[in-house]
Amino acid sequence: MSAKTDEILESLKTLSLLEASELVKQIEEAFGVSAAASAGAVVMAAPGAAAGGGEAAEEKTEFDVILESFDAAAKIKVLKAVREATGLGLADAKGLVEKAPTPVKEGVAKAAAEDMKKAIEEAGGKVTLK
C-alpha cells in the first residue's frame, strides 16, 4: 500500500464507533453509495475473526437485538431508528415495530448490537440483547 493509504488506515483505526458511523453516512452522501450490503458482510465476518483469535474466555460474540416495546408517542422515532439499524424499507420496518416484542436483527456483533440498542432506546424503544 502507499504511504497515503497507510496514513488513512491508521487514522480510521483511531475512530470511535460513533465517529465511524458518521463517516460512513458522509461517504454514502458524498459518493451516492450505500454501505448496507457491505456492512452486513463485515458484521458477519467479525464474529468469526474474534473466535479465531483463540481467546481463553468464552465471551458471547453474537447477539440478537430484540425490540421489547416502545412508547406509543415515540413510534415514528423508533421506526426511523429500526430502519436505520436494519436497512429495511418503511413498510417492512413498520411491520417489525408493530409486532414488538420481536427480534430486530439477529447474529449481530457485540459493538453493533450495543449501538443499535442505544439508538433505538434513545428514540423511545425498550431493547434487550440476547
Curated annotation (Swiss-Prot):
GO molecular function, one term: structural constituent of ribosome
Entry annotated with the keyword Ribosomal protein: yes
Gene3D superfamilies, per database record: 3.30.1390.10, Single helix bin
A Pfam family recorded for this sequence: Ribosomal_L12_N
GO CC term, one of those recorded: cytosolic large ribosomal subunit
Origin: domain of life: Bacteria
Biological process annotations from GO: translation
Self-association state and partner proteins as the record states: Homodimer. Part of the ribosomal stalk of the 50S ribosomal subunit. Forms a multimeric L10(L12)X complex, where L10 forms an elongated spine to which 2 to 4 L12 dimers bind in a sequential fashion. Binds GTP-bound translation factors.
Similarity section: Belongs to the bacterial ribosomal protein bL12 family.
Role according to the record: Forms part of the ribosomal stalk which helps the ribosome interact with GTP-bound translation factors. Is thus essential for accurate translation.
Record-linked PANTHER family: 39S RIBOSOMAL PROTEIN L12, LARGE RIBOSOMAL SUBUNIT PROTEIN BL12M
Protein name: Large ribosomal subunit protein bL12
Name of the gene this protein is made from: rplL
